[in-house]
Regions:
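Short glycine-rich anion-binding loops that position phosphate/pyrophosphate groups of nucleotides
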Residues: 9, 38, 67-68, 93-96, ...
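A cross-family phosphate/adenosyl-ligand binding-site feature
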Residues: 3, 17-78, 82-84
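Alpha-helix C-terminal capping segments
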Residues: 75-82, 109-120
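Electrostatically charged, flexible surface regions
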Residues: 71, 136-254
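Short beta-strand segments
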Residues: 33-35, 65, 90-93, 123-125, ...
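Short, Asp-centered acidic motifs that coordinate Mg2+ and/or phosphate
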Residues: 87
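Glycine/threonine-rich flexible loop motifs
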Residues: 96-105
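Glycine-rich phosphate/pyrophosphate-binding loops
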Residues: 115-137
Length: 254
């Protein structure tokens, strides 16, 4: 099985190294095509107004001056060519990708691009807690990742579907199993704008989520992570809401 590994945190990210270890537990044919720099939050964007620059790091590792989606396209269509990947793994992201995160995430978008190209694709992310990004428990993803990916592949991924996996902020032995969960929703009132002024008196801003108690919905990816369970969420490319489609069709045909 040929595996293409990518991410949105960049070619030097520790999560990418973790995912390479996971991939090599599954196959000895692993290729890496990742962004040259951090592309967190770029979602499914493509570089249409700038050329893509490709740098070969080693025989099977490449860095791209572009987005995660650019990396998948270059990896599949140019680097691997006629011998394309059987599986695309994206991550392991530095921080969870749950709830509304999936609409912003370059990690998720890379898996989406793989799905568009007809390749089984899985996005993986490692949550972190009060300790912040500097204290991520990569061992959680590293130890549980291979068996979770194997089970997903054994179960099967239908066309047009990608799988979003999130590992909780805990040691591997503390994981309370796997939860197949729905995409959750956060309290967007917690999103804050931090206004500041630079040394020249010019204003600038940071976006951040304020820390507050929040009860995630039952059966959601947020709830699973809070309960120290690995969340597995199927996502689909078709964003059509069928009930609303039917309701609007009836309304406009009246």
């Amino acid at each position: 099985m040929r595996i293409l590994v990518t991410n949105d945190d960049g070619i030097h990210a520790p999560g990418l190294a973790t995912l390479e270890e996971i991939a090599r537990e599954l196959s000895d044919d692993v290729w890496v095509v990742a962004p040259e720099s951090d592309q967190s939050g770029v979602s499914h964007s493509l570089s249409l107004n700038d050329p893509l620059r490709l740098r070969q790091v080693s025989e099977t590792r490449f860095a791209v001056k572009g987005t995660p989606s650019d990396c998948v396209i270059l990896g599949v269509r140019h680097i691997l060519g006629e011998h394309g990947p059987d599986l695309i793994l994206s991550g392991v992201n530095r921080g969870q990708n749950v709830a509304e995160d999936v609409t912003y995430s370059g990690t998720i978008a890379a898996a989406m691009e793989g799905t568009i190209l007809g390749i089984r694709s899985i996005a993986l992310s490692q949550a972190y807690g009060a300790g912040g990004r500097s204290n991520l428990k990569w061992d959680c993803a590293r130890e549980h990742g291979p068996q979770v990916v194997r089970k997903i592949l054994e179960t099967g991924i239908e066309p047009g579907i990608l799988i979003n996996v999130n590992f909780p902020d805990c040691e591997p032995a503390e994981v309370q199993g796997v939860a197949v969960a729905a995409q959750g929703f956060r309290n967007q009132a917690l999103l804050s704008i931090d206004a500041r002024v630079d040394g020249r008196g010019n204003p600038y801003f940071w976006l951040a989520f304020a820390k507050a108690r929040f009860e995630p919905g039952h059966g959601s990816d947020l709830k699973a992570i809070a309960e120290k369970r690995i969340s597995v969420t199927p996502l689909r490319l078709d964003l059509t809401d069928e009930p609303t489609l039917t309701r609007f069709a009836q309304a406009f045909s009246a």
